[in-house]
Amino acid sequence: MKLHDLRPAKDAKKKRKRVGRGTGSGRGFTSGRGSKGQNARSGGGVRPTFEGGQTPLFRKLPKKGFNNIFKKVYNEVNVYQLNKFNKGEEVTPEKLLEKGIIDKVARSGVKILGNGELDKALTVKAHAFTKSAREKIEAAGGKAEVI
């Protein structure tokens, strides 16, 4: 079999429905829109939340909560993820970004969490550390510095 022998499966390619091309086509005159009314007009139809004049569900439900602008949002990195670095290397948010451990530096920066084990001495510079993460970094012979 060669590339020029390849054909799509039967009925795999559906033809586009061309409407409004004469009554003989079967899709002429009203073009499948029915006769008159809001939905027959161009730009017609109702918005997704419209329920025919009945009070919509989103207005019946109470407002709840708020977004705290002072909330601290960190990128969370576990201790075991730092094993990707070489012994004695300095770990910064920029280097975590380079290695693909984080996607982007969050609003409040990077926080190191204590899940897993660290088997290398590293100098870790981050915006926050959990108590267990700091202990594990120092137990491996490294340093945990808050930036």
From Swiss-Prot:
Pfam families: Ribosomal_L27A
InterPro entries: Ribosomal_uL15, Ribosomal_uL15/eL18, Ribosomal_uL15/eL18_sf, Ribosomal_uL15_bac-type, Ribosomal_uL15_CS
Alphabetically ordered keywords of this record: Ribonucleoprotein, Ribosomal protein, RNA-binding, rRNA-binding
Subunit composition and interactions: Part of the 50S ribosomal subunit.
Function: Binds to the 23S rRNA.
The protein's name: Large ribosomal subunit protein uL15
Domain of life: Bacteria
UniProt GO MF annotations: rRNA binding; structural constituent of ribosome
GO cellular component: cytosolic large ribosomal subunit
Family under the similarity heading: Belongs to the universal ribosomal protein uL15 family.
Gene3D superfamilies: 3.100.10.10
Gene: rplO
GO biological process: translation
Basic and acidic residues: bias regions: 1-11
UniProt feature, compositional bias: Gly residues: 21-35
Stretches for region Disordered: 1-57
